[in-house]
Amino acid sequence: MANATVDNKANSEKIKALELAVSTIEKQFGKGSIMRLGANESLVKDVEAISTGALSLDIALGIGGLPKGRICEIYGPESSGKTTLCLSVIAQAQKKGGVVAFVDAEHALDINYARKLGVNTEDLLISQPDTGEQALEITETLVRSGAIDVLVVDSVAALVPRAEIEGDMGDSHVGLQARLMSQALRKLTAAINRSNTLVIFINQIRMKIGVMFGNPETTTGGNALKFYSSVRLDVRRVGAIKNGEDVTGNRTAVKVVKNKMAPPFTKVEFDLMYGEGISEEGDLLDLAVTANMVEKSGAWFSINGERMGQGRDAAKNFLKEHPEYMVELRKKILAANGIGKLLVDTNGNNGEDHEGTEPVEIEAEDAAPKKGKKGKH
C-alpha cells in the first residue's frame, strides 16, 4: 500500500513537471509548438497523393501517387522521360483544381508539348531564373505562400551558383552547388510540410571516376536531396515503340529507389508515346492482362467474351474507342489493390470492391507487373 502511494506521488509529480515544461514551451514558441500526437488530426491523417498519370506507377508507389507535403526526386539519363512524367503529374494536379508552378532552370520547357500532355499552360506558373540562388528563393516564396499544390524544379544540375556564373570559365568551385542545395533543403523541408505542397526535383546522372566495383552512377547536387526526398524515382528508356519503320514512342521503366510511404524497390514499365505522353490505354491493358481481367490467347485480346483485336496496338485502340471499358477496368484494378479510396476514376466515382479480381503485385526485379497475392501494396 505504501509503495503504491509513493508511485502515485511520483507519477503526479512527473505529470506536473511535464505540464510546466509544455506551458513554458508554448509561452516561448507559441501555441501548437508542442502537443500530443493524438490531439493533432493533421499529423495522423492519411497522406494526400497526386496521381502520376500512370496507374501502374501509382500502385507501385503504394499510396496512389506522389505524396503532398513531401520532396520527391526524379532522375535518369537524358531523354528518358523525366520531364514528361513531371508534366503528367502537373496535368493530373490541374484536373483536380490544383495550382502548379514550374521552375525552369534549364530554360528548355516546350509549351506546345506540355499542352499536348494535357497541361493547362494558361494557368501554369513558370519561372526561368538566372542563378541557383534565385531559383531556390523563388521556390521558397511560392511554397511559403501555401497556395501551390505542385512545384517542379527542372533541374538540379542547372541550379548554377551565382559565384560560378559571375566567375571565369576555368574557375574551380568545389562543392558549391552541394552546399547551396543542402542549405536550401534545410530551409524548405518544414515549409513544404506545413503548406502541403508536392515539390519535385528533376535531376541528371553523372559518372563517378575510378569506380571499379558497384554502380558508378550518381546524381548532381550532393547527398542532401537523397536524404530529404520521401520518394526517389529512377526513370530509364528501355526500348523504342515502332509502327512499321516509324518510331512512335518509348517503352519506359521506372524504379522506386526510395519510398518512405510504402515498400521501395518496386519497378514498372509503361509506354511513353510521342506527342501524347503516358499511354493510359497501354498501361491499363498490361495491368488488366496480369490480373486476368482481360484474356490473352496468342496474339488475341478479349474482354468479357468480346474480341478486342489481334495484337497489343489493336487492343489499345479498342480501349481508346470504348472508354466505358477503361473506366470499368480502372475501378476493378484500384479496388483489387486496395487504393480505390485514394484514386478517382474518370467519372469521378471512387473505386468499389469487385469480387473475382486479383490484386496486381509489382515485382522489384521484373520489368512488368505480375499477378500475386494482395500484400504490401
From Swiss-Prot:
<dbReference type="GO" id="GO:0006281">
    <property type="term" value="P:DNA repair"/>
</dbReference>
<keyword id="KW-0067">ATP-binding</keyword>
<feature type="binding site">
    <location>
        <begin position="76"/>
        <end position="83"/>
    </location>
    <ligand>
        <name>ATP</name>
    </ligand>
</feature>
<dbReference type="InterPro" id="IPR020588">
    <property type="entry name" value="RecA_ATP-bd"/>
</dbReference>
<comment type="similarity">
    <text>Belongs to the RecA family.</text>
</comment>
<keyword id="KW-0742">SOS response</keyword>
<dbReference type="GO" id="GO:0003697">
    <property type="term" value="F:single-stranded DNA binding"/>
</dbReference>
<dbReference type="InterPro" id="IPR049428">
    <property type="entry name" value="RecA-like_N"/>
</dbReference>
<dbReference type="Pfam" id="PF21096">
    <property type="entry name" value="RecA_C"/>
</dbReference>
<comment type="function">
    <text>Can catalyze the hydrolysis of ATP in the presence of single-stranded DNA, the ATP-dependent uptake of single-stranded DNA by duplex DNA, and the ATP-dependent hybridization of homologous single-stranded DNAs. It interacts with LexA causing its activation and leading to its autocatalytic cleavage.</text>
</comment>
<dbReference type="GO" id="GO:0005524">
    <property type="term" value="F:ATP binding"/>
</dbReference>
<dbReference type="Pfam" id="PF00154">
    <property type="entry name" value="RecA"/>
</dbReference>
<dbReference type="GO" id="GO:0140664">
    <property type="term" value="F:ATP-dependent DNA damage sensor activity"/>
</dbReference>
<dbReference type="InterPro" id="IPR013765">
    <property type="entry name" value="DNA_recomb/repair_RecA"/>
</dbReference>
<dbReference type="GO" id="GO:0009432">
    <property type="term" value="P:SOS response"/>
</dbReference>
<keyword id="KW-0233">DNA recombination</keyword>
<protein>
    <recommendedName>
        <fullName>Protein RecA</fullName>
    </recommendedName>
</protein>
<keyword id="KW-0963">Cytoplasm</keyword>
<dbReference type="GO" id="GO:0005829">
    <property type="term" value="C:cytosol"/>
</dbReference>
<dbReference type="InterPro" id="IPR020584">
    <property type="entry name" value="DNA_recomb/repair_RecA_CS"/>
</dbReference>
<dbReference type="InterPro" id="IPR020587">
    <property type="entry name" value="RecA_monomer-monomer_interface"/>
</dbReference>
<keyword id="KW-0234">DNA repair</keyword>
<dbReference type="InterPro" id="IPR049261">
    <property type="entry name" value="RecA-like_C"/>
</dbReference>
<dbReference type="GO" id="GO:0003684">
    <property type="term" value="F:damaged DNA binding"/>
</dbReference>
<dbReference type="GO" id="GO:0016887">
    <property type="term" value="F:ATP hydrolysis activity"/>
</dbReference>
<dbReference type="InterPro" id="IPR027417">
    <property type="entry name" value="P-loop_NTPase"/>
</dbReference>
<keyword id="KW-0238">DNA-binding</keyword>
<dbReference type="InterPro" id="IPR023400">
    <property type="entry name" value="RecA_C_sf"/>
</dbReference>
<feature type="region of interest" description="Disordered">
    <location>
        <begin position="346"/>
        <end position="377"/>
    </location>
</feature>
<dbReference type="InterPro" id="IPR003593">
    <property type="entry name" value="AAA+_ATPase"/>
</dbReference>
<keyword id="KW-0547">Nucleotide-binding</keyword>
<keyword id="KW-0227">DNA damage</keyword>
<dbReference type="GO" id="GO:0006310">
    <property type="term" value="P:DNA recombination"/>
</dbReference>
